[in-house]
Amino acid sequence: GWGGRFNPIHTMLATGTDAVAGRHDKAGLRYADDMVTMPLQCGTQWDGLGHIFYGETMWNGYDARLVDSTGAKKHGIHKARAGMIGRGVLLDIPRYRGGDYLEEGYGIGNADLDGCAKAQGVKIKPGDFVIVRTGQMEHCLARGDWGTYAAGDAPGLRFETAEWIHRNKIAAICCDTWGCEVRPNESTEAFQPWHWIVIPMIGIWMGEIFYLQDLAAVCARDTVYEFLFC
């Protein structure tokens, strides 16, 4: 996959076959053991402030070299492990537009975000955790094929929404797609250009590959689109 990412690999280190074959007899204990090898971005995850660099710096002007082979000396996502809590708001864009999911390549603009919030009767406030549903994940699950979900064409946020994020002073933006922003990207001169602005310039945490089907169903049933995010 992109960036050397791959699906989780499950490896058996010891099995019942080993036990029956006598491979464990010397230790006197017969057992099964295993391990999983996986990139941390192969599933639901947060893009921390040390994930994207603009030139040679990250958010707040820190040198990109502060993220090295030993980890992040600045802006590691672990710093937020006890503080990622606040008012969550779901913006269900396909439901607002009258469908089950958005087509690949559909760019969600500021008008979509504002229109959806108004239709749902919810107001975006500073510090909110805004969760944008496209329905792409559910569409893949329903057809039984992930296709090019990882780094392929996808509905997502347009470049202009960086201004919306900054203006509304939200704490984080989340989505049910691989990379939140629309793909193909709006510019052919930069890969994931929205990331370049939102993380290292605005300083926003970004949640990706969020499973939203159940949350969306409950919000629609109750006609309540705000909740405790933690």
Model-derived features: positions:
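Active-/binding-site microenvironments in catalytic and ligand-binding cores
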Residues: 1-230
